């Protein structure tokens, strides 16, 4: 089972990928650190049927209609390789920037989990993120 990690640049996708896989891929607090997709089995998941779960770290994107080479990698992977599920990593400190991309992902018919990252920082900004939690079919506060 392939699980794509998708979201805006600098939302925490690679940090999540490293936590799931045990890898140590480069992270930074600026856009453009991840420029190609990376795949690795998720550690500590055991299935009776032997199925392997693989995390796919995708470059940041603001839209499924690409404007940059990095967005093209993300859009082409999701549209052509059809992951089994998508974890949409959303920066809780800037929710409005993520809504368009999240909406596009939900319209694809692929199961989506919205993972709010940096929610500890957002608590200082008030409760705006509670409105986002009601958005979509699946939601999961994270990190």
Outline where the language-model segments fall:
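Conserved beta-strand scaffold positions in the cores of enzyme catalytic domains, especially
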Residues: 55, 142-143
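Conserved G1/Walker A P-loop phosphate-binding module
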Residues: 1-63, 81, 85
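Short alpha-helical
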Residues: 11, 69, 96
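Conserved C-terminal guanine-recognition region of P-loop GTPase G domains, centered on the G4
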Residues: 43-47, 73-141
């Amino acid at each position: 089972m392939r699980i794509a990690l998708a979201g805006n640049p600098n939302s925490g996708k690679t940090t999540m990928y490293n936590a799931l896989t045990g890898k140590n891929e480069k992270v930074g607090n600026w856009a453009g650190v991840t420029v190609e997709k990376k795949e690795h089995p998720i550690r500590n998941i055991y299935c009776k049927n032997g199925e392997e779960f693989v995390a796919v770290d995708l470059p940041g994107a603001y839209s499924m209609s690409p404007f940059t080479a990095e967005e093209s990698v993300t859009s082409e992977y999701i549209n052509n390789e059809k992951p089994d599920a998508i974890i949409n990593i959303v920066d809780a400190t800037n929710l409005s920037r993520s809504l368009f991309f999240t909406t596009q992902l939900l319209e694809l018919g692929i199961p989506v989990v919205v993972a709010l990252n940096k929610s500890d920082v957002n608590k200082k900004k008030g409760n705006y993120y509670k409105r986002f939690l009601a958005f979509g079919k699946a939601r999961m506060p994270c990190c």
